[in-house]
Regions:
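PLP-dependent enzyme catalytic core of the Aspartate aminotransferase-like
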Residues: 58, 124-125, 134, 140-175
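Active-site C-terminal subdomain of aminotransferase-like
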Residues: 1-107, 111-139
Length: 175
């Protein structure tokens, strides 16, 4: 629903009447096909199917490992808050139970009592987790947003965006 600069600002969902029923296919033909190609290479297709076939196993391990870590952190004296759907109460827990069937995901956020310095020290002391900004890998990943992805913001701006000084985010892998 946004103007496409590569087609002179065309908005595919607002095409004239004779083309309205074709909006999706025109968008697919003009941009998606151009950007991704008509078909996967055989090797890419092989990798895709290998990943798809093992997805349920990997997701189950992500969820189990993240749940174990969240429960451990929830009882740790240096952690003031854990953000994980499986530990929430009230409406949030009900939503998680309704929508996250089979597990609560692989992301765990937590606040360290020592603030920004504790967050940096925690990240620097990790041996198993990779210190990167992305999430959803088979490997365990960790980041301290206050000193990395949000470091250009003032402390007030960080807090307004939901990033507190001691907040650490883990993307729990399948190790």
């Amino acid at each position: 629903n946004t103007p496409d600069p590569s087609y002179h600002g065309a908005i595919f969902s607002q095409l004239p009447d004779p083309l309205t029923p074709l909006a999706f296919i025109l968008k697919a033909r003009t941009t998606l096909l151009r950007d991704m190609g008509g078909a996967m290479s055989p090797f890419n297709a092989f990798q895709f199917i290998q990943g798809l076939e093992t997805l349920p196993l990997r997701i189950r391990e992500h969820c189990k490992n993240a749940s174990d870590i969240a429960n451990f952190l929830n009882s740790h004296d240096k952690v003031t808050n854990v953000i994980y759907p499986g530990l929430m109460d009230g409406d949030y827990k009900k939503r998680a139970d309704d929508h996250l069937l089979g597990g609560f995901g692989g992301l765990v956020g937590f606040e360290l009592a020592g603030g920004a310095e504790a967050g940096k020290k925690f990240i620097d002391g990790l041996e198993l987790h990779y210190h990167v900004a992305n999430i959803g890998d088979a490997r365990s990943l960790a980041i301290h947003p206050s000193s990395t992805t949000h470091s250009q913001l003032t402390e007030d701006e960080q807090i307004a965006s939901g990033v507190t000084p001691g907040y650490v985010r883990l993307s729990v892998g399948i190790e």
